Every structure is written in C-alpha cells, then in structure tokens.
Amino acid sequence: MYEYINGLITNIYPAYLVIADRSGVGYKLFVANPYRFEQNVESHVYVEQIVRENEMTLYGFIDENEKYLFNKLLNVSGIGPKSALAILASDDAAGLVTAVANDDASYLTQFPGVGKKTAQQIVLDLKGKLDDLALSAGMTVETVPTTDNQALADALAALESLGYSAKDVAKLQTVLANQKDTTDGYIRSALKFLVK
C-alpha cells in the first residue's frame, strides 16, 4: 500500500499522469483532473492502490481530502473508481458535501455517470459521513437557512428533529417567513403544508 509519492511529474495525459520517484521508477496515476498538476515539477501526490482480479491500479490525489472523498465514494453501491474520479473531476467537493447534507439527489445527477438511482444511493450511503471532511477542509455546508424570528427557528428545528429533510425545512422557511405566529402555530402550518 502506498500513502503518497514524492517525485517529478514527467508526463501529463488526459486521464492520468506519470510521476517518477527519486529511484527512477515512474508510476502511472489515474487522477480526477491531471491538468491541476504541473509537468516537470517536484510534487507530493497522495495515492490509493486498488487491486482487482487481473490488475493493480494507482489513483492519485492533490490532497488528503480528495483521497478521503474518493474512498467514501467507493463505498457507495454502484460507484467504481472511474465514476468516483469523474465526480471529483468536477472540482466541487463542497457542492457534493452540501448536496448530501441536504438530501439533494437532483444536484448529484449533474455529475458524469450519476443517474437518479445512483444519486439517491450516494445521499443514502454518505449522509452524515462527510461532516468531518467539511470541518477539516474548512467547508461551510449550506443547510437550513437561519432566521431572526426565534419562534420560526424553533419550529424549523423541531421539524428537522422529527425527521423532515433539510431541503423540506428550507422550503418551509420561505413559505412561513411572512407569517407572524408562535412556535406551535408555525409547526401546525408547516405540517398542513407538508401533508398537501
């Protein structure tokens, strides 16, 4: 197993790059976007080795967070290394983390090779598992919008604790924001709206 490779990036191709270590061995690393790396520059590339029946493949990453996200994506049913790299190539890790946190499967369908079922599976499998990535990378996850109306804020928090998705709660906030009511009144109005 390799954790990372320090070396000179000797070649860059559309799907992979070649990095030569100090002993002169060149490693072919499949990467999400090879053009983020510079040719003929000493680099520190994080690596994940995947062994299949008849092949051993190395995948390279620009930082530890990208590698972490790659491994989390591999744990999703229906996502293989190539699909995970295609998702990472969008360079929108924050968008991915936010979409998972907000149960927004429709956002995930914009990634190559991700259909509706796979997007729903990503949300299901990764929900709550990317929070540590968001914190370590300094990402801000956009969840339920905040409000100055304390009664509305309490009602929205109560609805979320009842199991309603952050996306539904955010919609409710826009619907209920123009009303003046108690926390109980907001919850009743929200439940009526949700049952429609």
UniProtKB/Swiss-Prot annotation:
SMART domains on file: HhH1
Domain II: annotated segments: 63-141
Subcellular location: Cytoplasm
SUPFAM superfamilies assigned to the protein according to its UniProt record, in alphabetical order: DNA helicase RuvA subunit, C-terminal domain, Nucleic acid-binding proteins, RuvA domain 2-like
GO cellular component: cytoplasm; Holliday junction helicase complex; Holliday junction resolvase complex
Region (Domain I): 1-62
Keyword field contains Nucleotide-binding: no
GO molecular function, one term: four-way junction DNA binding
DNA damage recorded as keyword: yes
Subunit record text: Homotetramer. Forms an RuvA(8)-RuvB(12)-Holliday junction (HJ) complex. HJ DNA is sandwiched between 2 RuvA tetramers; dsDNA enters through RuvA and exits via RuvB. An RuvB hexamer assembles on each DNA strand where it exits the tetramer. Each RuvB hexamer is contacted by two RuvA subunits (via domain III) on 2 adjacent RuvB subunits; this complex drives branch migration. In the full resolvosome a probable DNA-RuvA(4)-RuvB(12)-RuvC(2) complex forms which resolves the HJ.
The family this protein is said to belong to: Belongs to the RuvA family.
Domain text: Has three domains with a flexible linker between the domains II and III and assumes an 'L' shape. Domain III is highly mobile and contacts RuvB.
Function: The RuvA-RuvB-RuvC complex processes Holliday junction (HJ) DNA during genetic recombination and DNA repair, while the RuvA-RuvB complex plays an important role in the rescue of blocked DNA replication forks via replication fork reversal (RFR). RuvA specifically binds to HJ cruciform DNA, conferring on it an open structure. The RuvB hexamer acts as an ATP-dependent pump, pulling dsDNA into and through the RuvAB complex. HJ branch migration allows RuvC to scan DNA until it finds its consensus sequence, where it cleaves and resolves the cruciform DNA.
Name assigned to this protein: Holliday junction branch migration complex subunit RuvA
Species name: Leuconostoc citreum (strain KM20)
